């Protein structure tokens, strides 16, 4: 889970600690002073530390954290600019043009996706579902793509967004930052908690929606930026596994952090990072994240696919009508999963009859090996192969 899902738990822990201390502490008896106490020196404010590479400088006042908005030139390091994560409300004095350029560059999905979009390959006519944390549906980046929005296990009265929700939706279907801006998204919001029950309920709800849709117009795939089937990370993982089996039997392709399977095809996932000087080159991508070399052993797997997970600009909205964008120098696999499902949507636009097994196998067969031997998703080669071998 990303930062906001952890934030609530952290704040709760702090609150409980403070309450417990206040309610249970018994003041010790104090003898009357016989000598006037010495004056206490006023506390000296600790010097502001310069942000380190890959620190998050986003200004998010809505939730009472990350309150610093403006950084003077001596409060950041210009050499680290492309390593910082920040949003469009962060001000780095003296580097405004550079941060604006990073935000703009991060809008590009990379790997040649924009060349496909220029040809009209946008996922038009394809229906996709997302199971993730809540979002507000009025952000112009994604509002036109949301076909339905449902909540499971969430207090709807809060009317709050999260970091995760608009980010994954915009990576998949954003109008200016997304891989497949032509898709229709059925969004199932779940709490940012390590409990698979809401995920399982959401997946079954998607199956019910599909029962109402005509043949040829059903939801094809589900993007889940989590691992609800992992018993070590999630409670009630068996509930998810049961729902997943039902979905697969119904012909729904579900991609999670644990990958996907269909017929004899199997797909596992690895993080990768754009080469900022060759953003459209899959082979130039680095294995892992910018601040982490990743699992190099993954390159030996014949069914592991590297996905771009860093240096992305994504939609951001925490309260209604406060729509913006953030630049993530370091994302994570959560950002790679909707990217991959977006590429799938492009493929189904070109080859609507493509089976789930053919989808997974073609993604692997057309991937480009990088310098480490990890096979990186190659949207252009993927689409060209489908047009040649599967398109009607």
Regions found by a protein language model. Give the residues of each.
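C-terminal motif of bacterial Sec signal peptides marking the signal peptidase cleavage site
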Residues: 15-18
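Bacterial lipoprotein signal-peptidase II cleavage site
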Residues: 20-28
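Substrate-binding/access-modulating region of protease and related hydrolase catalytic domains
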Residues: 52-65, 80, 123, 191-273, ...
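Acidic-leg catalytic submotif of subtilisin-like serine proteases
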Residues: 71-72, 88, 111-153, 252-256
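C-terminal subdomain of the subtilisin-like protease fold in secreted/lumenal serine endopeptidases
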Residues: 88, 215-225, 238, 349-392
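N-terminal domain-start motif of subtilase-like serine proteases
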Residues: 100-128, 152-157, 286-290, 377-378
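Subtilisin-like peptidase catalytic core
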Residues: 126, 133, 146, 152-235
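Extracellular S/T/G-rich loop segment that most often corresponds to the catalytic His/Ser-adjacent loop
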Residues: 132, 249-252, 257-349, 353
């Amino acid at each position: 889970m990303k930062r906001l899902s952890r934030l609530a738990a952290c704040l709760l822990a702090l609150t409980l600690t403070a309450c417990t201390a206040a309610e249970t502490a018994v003041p010790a008896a104090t003898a009357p002073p016989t000598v006037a106490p010495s004056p206490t020196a006023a506390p000296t404010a600790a010097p502001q530390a310069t942000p380190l590479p890959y620190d998050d400088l986003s200004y998010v006042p809505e939730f009472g954290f990350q309150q610093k908005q403006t950084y003077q030139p001596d409060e950041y390091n210009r050499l680290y600019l492309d390593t910082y994560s920040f949003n469009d409300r962060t001000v780095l004095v003296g580097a405004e043009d550079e941060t604006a350029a990073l935000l703009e560059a991060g809008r590009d999905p990379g790997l040649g996706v924009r060349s496909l979009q220029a040809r009209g390959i946008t996922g038009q006519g394809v229906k996709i579902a997302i199971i993730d944390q809540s979002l507000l549906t009025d952000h112009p980046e994604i509002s036109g793509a949301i076909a339905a929005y449902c909540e499971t296990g969430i207090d709807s009265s809060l009317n709050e967004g999260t970091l995760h929700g608009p980010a994954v939706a915009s990576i998949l279907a954003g109008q200016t930052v997304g891989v497949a801006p032509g898709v229709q998204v059925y969004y199932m919001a779940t709490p940012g908690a390590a409990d698979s029950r809401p995920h399982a309920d959401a997946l079954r709800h998607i199956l019910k929606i599909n029962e109402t849709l005509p043949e040829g117009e059903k939801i094809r795939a589900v993007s889940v930026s989590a691992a609800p089937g992992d018993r070590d990370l999630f409670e009630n993982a068996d509930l998810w596994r049961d729902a997943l089996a039902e979905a697969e039997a119904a012909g729904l392709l579900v991609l999670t952090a644990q990958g996907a399977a269909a017929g004899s095809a199997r797909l596992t996932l690895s993080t990768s990072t754009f080469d900022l000087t060759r953003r459209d080159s899959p082979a130039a991508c680095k294995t892992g994240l910018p601040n982490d070399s990743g699992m190099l052993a993954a390159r030996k797997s014949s069914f592991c696919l590297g996905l771009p997970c860093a240096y992305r600009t994504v939609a951001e909205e925490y309260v209604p009508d406060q729509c913006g964008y953030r630049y993530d120098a370091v994302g994570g696999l959560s950002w790679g999963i909707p990217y991959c499902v977006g590429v799938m949507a492009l493929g189904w636009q070109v080859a609507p009859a493509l089976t789930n097994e053919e989808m997974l196998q073609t993604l692997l067969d057309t991937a480009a090996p990088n310098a480490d031997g990890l096979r990186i998703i190659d949207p252009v080669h993927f689409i060209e192969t489908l047009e040649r071998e599967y398109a009607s």
